[in-house]
Amino acid sequence: MKLGRYLAVSKDLAPAKFIIAKCIEVEEFKGLELNELWEIHNKVLKKVDFDNFDFNDLEYVKPNLLDLKVEIAKNIFKNCHFCEHRCYVNRETERGFCRIKESYYSTEFLHLGEERVLVPSHTIFFCGCNFKCVFCQNWDISQVYFDKTIPNHCIPYNPKEMAKIIKHKRDYSKNVNFVGGDPTPHLLSILKTLSYLDKNIPVVWNSNMYLTVEGMHLLKGVVDVYLTDFKFGNNECGERLSKVKNYFDIIKRNHLLIKDEEVIIRHLVMPNHLDCCTEKIFDFISKNLDNAVVNVMFQYRPEYKAKEYPDINRRLTYEEIEKALELAEKYNLDLIYD
């Protein structure tokens, strides 16, 4: 059954992957170079089958795989390449494309507006983003570091305190859902949070998926469900409307890296973009991602700077909605709904 493991973790019938990662011992890595850390990481990860663990197998050890991931993320943070902007700045003192140094968040709450299988979802909204989408509907938090006209009400993020909040709300939530903006620039903070968290809960990575391969490797063995936002079916639309290069190539690659994981793909249908984007995305999913379920979303409205772009300066027509549904049927997608 698709999403079967997630459902088991959500009901406390199976351990979350980050819990398992804390039970996988690694050799002492203090003082090692980044390439040496990766060598240990990849060697250990190849041997682990996360589906073969139950609660009887669990015993926390030190140092463990999650500790190692945190250490690798600390190294990357100082020469940042979590995402494909690959700024290579030391974020302790410098700002890259996303303008984010330490992590801030806007809010956290039990979200009832996600997909039915996810709610109630304990959703943590990080401030900032590695995209500059001209149509962003969460622009007040995603674009706060880019646009000085947006009031900044972001809250300093403390991983240890957030772990306590997640634990407290677990009785009422099916999962913890890291989103933004985008969570990618906050990957170090998220891994630290999970290292403090001792409550079994599925981890949802809710992202635009513009990560580097290195960023993707850090997520492997930690994330239970990838909730991905697949926006464009070509590189040109990605660069024009989200200001990122090689969009389609990178997002395809990253989805192929998680083709054996549990994945929910969201696609926001946009006016005038069914041929260039929607159909191309559906075709790719149909040919490559058997495990994925898809949420075709029709709630597009021209937000933020969309009025400056004539092709997306309106809502969808009935005909466009109907065509998108016909395409989903044509490509035999496994649909999921809000």
UniProtKB/Swiss-Prot annotation:
InterPro entries: Aldolase_TIM, MJ0674-like, Pyrv-formate_lyase-activ_prd, rSAM. It holds the Pfam family Radical_SAM. This is Uncharacterized protein MJ0674. The keyword 4Fe-4S applies. Binds 1 [4Fe-4S] cluster. The cluster is coordinated with 3 cysteines and an exchangeable S-adenosyl-L-methionine. The keyword Magnesium does not apply. One of its GO terms (molecular function) is 4 iron, 4 sulfur cluster binding. Its cofactor is [4Fe-4S] cluster. [4Fe-4S] cluster binds at C129, C133, C136. Residues 111-334 form the Radical SAM core domain. Keywords: 4Fe-4S, Iron, Iron-sulfur, Metal-binding, S-adenosyl-L-methionine.
